Regions:
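Intrinsically disordered, low-complexity segments enriched in small/polar residues
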Residues: 1-9, 19-132
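Short solvent-exposed strand-capping/beta-turn motif centered on an Asx-Ser/Thr pair
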Residues: 11-15
Length: 132
């Protein structure tokens, strides 16, 4: 997979932005399994843009009871200028929550992502996260 230098950040409990790394298309912050996994992708060519959101887990099983509710997502440019904000719905989809600009759609986590050329800084603040 090619990500062309994307940088993604999530604020930790202290409010400090923590850079996330890619792994099989997913990001994991160790060691806390309750930390949120966020996959942000944009596929140039078909206009698909979305956010794939779930709790951290080494496997996709055993996460059904660990939903996060995300109310707002803010995209920032590299200089931290706000680009756009989205208000997200919450959908119970077997532990897999996905928001796209047009509609909900199910994607396999092994989705091959090609031609990703933009660089974003992605923040989710503590107040945007809440457990059910």
């Amino acid at each position: 997979m090619n990500y062309y230098g994307y940088d993604f950040y999530i604020r930790n409990d202290s409010g400090v932005p923590v850079k996330m790394d890619w792994g099989l298309g997913l990001k994991r912050i160790e060691p806390d399994d309750s930390v949120l996994l966020v996959q942000v992708w944009e596929v140039i060519g078909n206009g698909v843009r979305g956010f794939d959101v779930m709790p951290d887990s080494k496997y996709w099983s055993n996460i059904d009871s660990q939903y996060y509710r995300i109310n707002k997502v803010s995209l920032y440019s590299e200089d931290e200028s706000l680009i756009r904000e989205w208000t997200l719905e919450t959908k119970d989809d077997g532990g897999h929550q996905l928001f796209s600009e047009e509609h909900w759609k199910r994607y396999d986590y092994k989705l091959k992502i090609e031609s990703v050329i933009r660089k974003w800084i992605f923040y989710i603040t503590d107040e945007d996260l809440s457990l059910p």
